[in-house]
Amino acid sequence: MQAYIPQLISELKEFYGDDLYNLESYSNIPEHLEALAQRMHIGVRESHSFILTEISNYHKDYLGKKEVINPKEFSIDDCRQTIANEYGFASWTALNQQPNLLYNYDFEKAINFLLDGNLPAIRKVISEKPELLTERSKYGHNATLLNYAGSNGVEFWRQQVPLNLPEIVTYLLEVGADKTAIMKVYGGEFNLSLIHI
């Protein structure tokens, strides 16, 4: 399986490491995102360019302003707000008002199979659990599996493109994925219907 992974995304994935994938290590989503915010704060203090880029993509006060982020002044609360926004929540407070927010591990695995271009694994998991076609992310953006095929508007580290994306999208549509399914991103609601699929 192959995917186009921009260098920035590769660096992010390497930096966060297992914290991105070992979801079972956390009792709920807020606890997991707290761990990511703590890791981000380390990256800020170490002035990693890829972390500053991540922040400039999601923190409302720094959108497109990577050069004005001062690592010495960027607090853990700023990191929490960045992570909350990246994962589709309006604020860290809004995220933490949902302590029972739990992962659907099968859905998360299916997303990773999609983004890695592992069509055989996607076919297998969908045949075993067809409800994954209509499942929505527990993150604030509520993306479906097909929304993740858009490779944008979702978690920064997941913004990569499998080289066999057309085949994956064709398969998902053939087995019933809804191309009009809405996800909440960029301050509005969007779907993939504008893309000719």
Residue ranges and their predicted role:
Residues 1-122, 128:
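Long, non-globular segments of proteins
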Residues 95, 172, 177-185:
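Charged low-complexity stretches with an acidic bias
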Residues 103-112, 134-156, 181-194:
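Ankyrin-repeat boundary/"N-cap" motif
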Residues 121, 164-168:
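Conserved ankyrin/ankyrin-like repeat signature
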Residues 126-132, 167-178:
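Ankyrin repeat domain, specifically the short helix-to-loop turn at the C-terminus of the second helix
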Residues 158-162:
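Short consensus segments that form the blades of beta-propeller domains
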